[in-house]
Amino acid sequence: MINVTLKGGVVKEFEAGVSAADVAKSIGAGLYRSACAARVDGEACDLRTALDKDCQLEILTFEDKDGRHAFWHTAAHIMAQAIQHLYPAAKFGIGPALDDGWYYDIGGTAPFTPDQFEAIEAEMKKIVKADLPVEKRFITVEEGREIFKGQDYKLELLEEYAEKGWQLSVYTQGDFTDLCAGPHLMSTGAVKAVKLLSAASAYWRGDAARDSLCRMYGTAFPKASELEAHLAMLEEAKKRDHRKLGKELELFTLLEEGPGFPFFLPKGMTLKNTLIDYWREVHHRAGYQEISTPIILSRKLWERSGHWDHYKDNMYTTVIDEEDFAIKPMNCPGGMLVYKTKPRSYRDLPLRVGELGLVHRHELSGALHGLMRVRCFTQDDAHIFMTPDQIKDEIKGVVQLIDQVYSLFGFEYHIELSTMPEDHIGELADWEVATDALRQAIEELGRTYEINEGDGAFYGPKLDFHLVDAIGRTWQCGTIQLDMQMPERFELEYTGEDGQKHRPVMIHRVVFGSIERFIGILIEHFAGAFPTWLAPEQVRVIPIAEAHRGYAQEIERQLDAAGVRVSADLRNEKMGYKIREGQLQRIPYMLVVGAKEMEDGTVSVRARKEENGGVMTLDAFTEMIQKEIAARER
């Protein structure tokens, strides 16, 4: 018999060899029906997995991230099977689950078009109706060569995995078999509602010198109503697309002369600088000091930090005076050098140092996406150097700072604890200490979190903060990384109370993450209708006729002197046209002025939230908007 510890600490006894599915069935029929996968001792696996020793078991449904991934991964296989039925010459690349569906890269046929989606979906529904068992088995490389004969991309992956010494496994459902590690659903019948979304081109393995494949995107849900809600969200997302709104609102542009390098226009710079001013204000109050470090630094520094060995493929390099240099992809090593500029004492700690550093990372051209995925961005890094007994309090302080910032914009969020990856530096014992410190701090704050196994940075575990925007999408922005490796590599020291030299512990952390990406998220979150304090243009003055232009200009001067971002629309256009344009520009307030307003020294207010804001004296309006801006109201 074995003891299985379930969620909530309940321990149940089962015979060795019981499957995770059988355990789910013993808990309740409802859980069994909704189960997608399992997590055994922290690792996601199939429900068919046999439990042969004492373990911790969590049954994963579509409500769990890993459960959704198993669901969508199975749906990707169903799509591939349908395509295999309809287009036997198709050759399959990779087909991973994403955060809201899946894609599959397919060659061997002409690229698919939306006209073909309906037939593929119909074939998928047949496979779902057949409720085919999805079964995993382990194979040898020789068996794999036979199974995937003629499937060139699969054979390439097979040989690569075998060379790395990985255990090879396949999943079979009916007449379709795929090279895959899983996990998957137990059968195809649970995928009730499917939708193919789009097709795009993608190079095999992201290499422009390799074959161009058709990347098919799709999504699926257990219920048709859930699919309908998701498709409605996608339609809303199209309207909010930051690339579209960024152009319409004249915030930024993307040019072929700089792929992945955004150009910020005057209004976009106003927005960016407003965010930066706020960042500086809250960090000053939280006891941070701001620094700036060079963009280009010597190869020796990157070798010392570990980036040259672990991150070089993402770095831009150059040669200066016959010596290798790199444009910084991260701010951390520069922060280490700043710490070393003078001797440090325990009395100096914790030392909180912030930097709005411009970093460059080489991203594949196919991965670039507006401001969300770029090659050049401003990272709001901070590094906190501390003694071991200060770790928990400093982590708590950062969590509270992140909460303060996200709450200002109306974001809810959830937290993930990411643990040691395969490619890491440092001793296991140090990783365990660092991971436990993050866990204890977050638990003492009463915050819930999920474990994200193996997704830590190469130098330490981290807490990732995932925002939920106005239409329910999640975005990973804030990060707290606890690092005991970098201080060792850079030989950082402080003099302790005992007069001896000690090694500080360090936190890397960001709040916005990439400021450019955060702006993209804000554009979509607010659909371009920014809160007044953040809006690039807060007020537009519209004279009714030419005779009122002088009064409009006087209002513009007075509001500008009061610190309000204002413009007067003096064009020879109809008032209705000007008002409509102001609405399209999402300007918080329009002040319409004519003969009566000019005579009375008033303004007719049209607020974005309520079209008729009434008539006010200019002084009263100025006082009102100044208070709104100062309070940073949403």
Annotated model-derived regions:
Residues M1-K91, D99, D105-R634:
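NTP/phosphate- and nucleic-acid-binding module
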